[in-house]
Every structure is written in C-alpha cells, then in structure tokens.
Amino acid sequence: IQIVDAQNRPMFDLAGTLLKDYATALLLEVGKYLNTVPNRITISGHTDETPFTGRRPNYTNWELSADRANAARRALIDGGLAYDKIARVIGMSSYVLLDKANPRNPVNRRISVIVMTKAAEDALLRTDTPSDAPSNTPSNRPIETTPAR
C-alpha cells in the first residue's frame, strides 16, 4: 500500500516528522482496515533527496525517515491496528523515490505500508533470528565487560 494523497500533497513538511492532519486521518482509517486482514505489515518511511540540515548533528535522512515510519506506526495503532500486526518499522531515506524524475518532489516524503504474505513474514522472521547465525559471530558471542573502578 503506497499511501499518497490524491492531490499529491506530502505527508510531512520538509524535514518534519509530524504527520499532516489529512495524513493522520487517512492512517487512522487504514489502521481499522488492516486489522481485518490476517497478515502482518511492515512500515517504511521515506524522504526526498533534500539533505537534512537541522541543528541536530549526525541526524540525517536515515533518522528522519525512520522517525516518519514510527509516526505512521503510532497513527495506525491509534486507528485501531493491533500492535502485534506490525512486523517491522524501517527508514529508507531517499533510496526508494516515488518521483524518480524529480527527487526533491515533496510527494517523495511519504510512508509505505506492505501487507506481507505468510511466506514473506516467515522469511523475515528467519533472517532476524539470532540463532540462525553461526555461534562465533559477534551477535552471539558473550559480551565481556570490565567493572568500573
């Protein structure tokens, strides 16, 4: 589900993480509907190619897109979506543009909701399971710490 306003209005202001009122209203309705399907969903946040130049050091379009995805997640849950229906929330920065011909087009500031098939959900869960990794990988090694003195 690519959520785009019929008038091609952006879902977010430039560099913003607060959903526009019309986007919130749409997500509240979508949240109710998504609860009627048995599948889980993923939510992706997107930016246009305008570099983020806010006052926060090291805050880039990656963080901005992830914050947008979480704003959408909250609106979907407020609309009635069950918390356990969400399998993943991710930020995509500007790597999946809706308007590739105009990468700074505000319509690229959006979220995507993917309703997964059972096979896709199973594959996602398999790739995120630490027990699938060899035991000598950093993710499964015990963390060694030295107590502070």
Residue spans for each PLM region:
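Periplasmic OmpA-like peptidoglycan-binding domain that tethers envelope proteins to the cell wall
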Residues: 4, 13-26, 46-126, 141-149
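Loop/turn elements at helix/coil->beta-strand transitions in domains of secreted/extracellular proteins
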Residues: 37-41, 85
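Hydrophobic alpha/beta scaffold of the E2-like acyltransferase core of 2-oxoacid dehydrogenase complexes
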Residues: 1-3, 9
